[in-house]
Amino acid sequence: MNSPVLQDCVREWGEIQENYQDIQETHRLYKQKLEELSKLQTRCSGTISRQKKKLRELSVELKKCKSKAKNVEEEEEQIRDLNNQIRAREKTFFEMESFLPKKNGLYLSLVLGNVNVTLLSKQAKFAYKDEYEKFKLYLTIILMVLSFICRFLLNSRVTDAVFNFLLVWYYCTLTIRESILINNGSRIKGWWVLNHYISTFLSGVMLTWPDGLMYQMFRNQFLSFSMYQSFVQFLQYYYQSGCLYRLRALGERHNMDLTVEGFQSWMWRGLTFLLPFLFFGQFWQLYNAITLFKLARHPECKEWQVIMCGLPFLVHFLGNFFTTLRVVHQKFQKQN
């Protein structure tokens, strides 16, 4: 005669078997829906591609018509109306494509391979974007504290190397995450993405710079700049995130828009006070470049890292300064 414990085990196994049948059926339906989803994605992507091609061809034809329709007011109005509708349709397709699998760019392909990084729901996209923003905030605070410690408390090449390694890892991670966000519909301006690639290169060169006279002559200036840069980035995140939240609530900004380390047109509403901080930081980048170019001409300078750090600082200044200046100029033009 079976023991009560064994009988309980047999009964439990029977219940597990019943649940297992349900799981198998649910999983079968899940795989079926996945196959259907894959077919729908392929069909939708193909249809959108064909429509976009036709829109491009139509835009070319409209340009030809515009050159022939000079001084014919009715035709010019029709052409303007069609162009506006084409632009609106292209924006709609952009929204649609953010929910469809797409081929990774060169950078993501090199880092991740041919992995689909498209998130299929608005909630997942927003959660990933929110996590990206928190990552930037937390690392900015950590970098600010660490640069303060290196600048005022510990004068050691080891702690400096830890700080520079953290910078390399931070900017590498940012570029990967931003590429994924772009694949999911974030409209990050070209310069602000390139800016992080340059920062990754600069941090990598700083990491390899051996201790010596040239390094010590630039060390305190670099750490002070890093501390100030982290402080400004913290200010930008704090105020930009609040501004973006209000504009999204008003329907004036896209849900996937991000905070940036610069100034964009939407920031005129309450964020112009950041401009002096930004311009000061940008001219500090120029000052860093000039300092490094002077050090490169020093009789005792033998390190290649000196000139290779000076060039990225100069590119940073030119890109940041003229991008910010263009936004300010465009805003004043619109006001006039």
Curated annotation (Swiss-Prot):
Its main location: membrane. It is a multi-pass membrane protein. CoA binds at K129, S186, R187, Q236, Y239, Q240, K331. Keywords: Cell membrane, Endoplasmic reticulum, Membrane, Nucleus, Transmembrane, Transmembrane helix. GO terms for biological process: detection of mechanical stimulus involved in sensory perception of pain; fat cell differentiation; monoatomic ion transmembrane transport. InterPro entries: TMEM120A/B. One of its GO terms (cellular component) is endoplasmic reticulum. The keyword Transmembrane applies. Pfam families: TMEM120A-B. It comes from the Eukaryota. GO terms for molecular function: coenzyme A binding; monoatomic ion channel activity. Residues 1-131, 177-189, 240-269, 330-336 are cytoplasmic. Residues 152-157, 209-217, 294-303 are extracellular. It is found in: Cell membrane; Nucleus inner membrane; Endoplasmic reticulum. The keyword Transmembrane applies. The chain crosses the membrane at residues 132-151, 158-176, 190-208, 218-239, 270-293, 304-329. Belongs to the TMEM120 family. The transmembrane domain (TMD) has structural homology to the very long chain fatty acid elongase 7, ELOVL7, despite low sequence homology between them. Homodimer. PANTHER family: ION CHANNEL TACAN, TRANSMEMBRANE PROTEIN INDUCED BY TUMOR NECROSIS FACTOR ALPHA. Multifunctional protein involved in mechanosensation, and plays an essential role in lipid metabolism. May function as a potential ion channel involved in sensing mechanical stimuli. TMEM120A is structurally similar to a lipid-modifying enzyme, ELOVL7, and contains a bound coenzyme A molecule, which suggests it might function as an enzyme in lipid metabolism. This is Transmembrane protein 120A.
